[in-house]
From Swiss-Prot:
One Pfam family matching this protein: Ribosomal_S9
InterPro entries in the cross-refs: Ribosomal_Su5_D2-typ_SF, Ribosomal_uS9, Ribosomal_uS9_bac/plastid, Ribosomal_uS9_CS, Ribsml_uS5_D2-typ_fold_subgr
Transmembrane segments: none
Gene this protein is translated from: rpsI
Record PROSITE patterns: RIBOSOMAL_S9 (PS00360)
Cellular component, GO annotation: cytosolic small ribosomal subunit
UniProt keywords, alphabetically: Ribonucleoprotein, Ribosomal protein
HAMAP family: Ribosomal_uS9_B
Oligomeric form and interacting partners: Part of the 30S ribosomal subunit.
Gene Ontology molecular functions: RNA binding; structural constituent of ribosome
Family: Belongs to the universal ribosomal protein uS9 family.
The protein, known as: Small ribosomal subunit protein uS9
SUPFAM superfamilies: Ribosomal protein S5 domain 2-like
Length: 130
C-alpha cells in the first residue's frame, strides 16, 4: 500500500482486526464496505469512531480495515483496539489520552466454557426439594 501509512492490530473476544491509517478525508472502509453499510447498529459505529473523536482526527485520516471472526460487538471492539494501536504508531504523544480513555488495554474477557452437569457456564438445573 502507501508509504506513509500506519498499522495496528486489534483483538476482542474471537474477532481480529487489521487497521491501516493514512492521511485523507475521514473515509472508513471495513472489508471493502463503508462503515455505515458494514455496521447496521449505531452503537457499533460509535465504538469504531471513539478513538478518532477523542484525538480529533476524524476528518484528517482515512482508515482501511480488514476484520474477521466473532460477531458485531466483538468486531467493533477489535476495530477500536486496532485504530488505537495504529494512532499510537502514527503519533506516540496520543498514547496518554487514549490510555486514560481505556482504549489501549486489550479487553481480555472471553466466553466462559459450558460445564458438564450444568445448562450453561453457570446456570444450574432447577433444584427440587421433593
Amino acid at each position: 500500500m502507501a508509504e506513509n501509512q500506519n498499522y495496528g492490530t486489534g483483538r476482542r473476544k474471537s474477532s481480529s482486526a487489521r487497521v491501516f491509517i493514512k492521511p485523507g478525508s475521514g473515509k472508513i472502509v471495513i472489508n471493502q464496505r463503508e462503515l455505515d453499510v458494514y455496521f447496521g447498529r449505531e452503537t457499533s459505529r460509535m465504538i469504531v469512531r471513539q478513538p478518532l473523536e477523542l484525538v480529533e482526527l476524524t476528518d484528517k485520516l482515512d482508515l482501511y480495515v480488514t476484520v474477521k471472526g466473532g460477531g458485531i460487538s466483538g468486531q467493533a471492539g477489535a476495530i477500536r483496539h486496532g485504530i488505537t494501536r495504529a494512532l499510537i504508531e502514527y503519533d506516540e504523544t496520543l498514547r496518554p489520552a487514549l490510555r486514560a480513555a481505556g482504549f489501549v488495554t486489550r479487553d481480555a474477557r472471553r466466553v466462559e466454557r459450558k460445564k458438564i452437569g450444568l445448562h450453561k457456564a453457570r446456570r444450574r438445573p432447577q433444584y427440587s426439594k421433593r
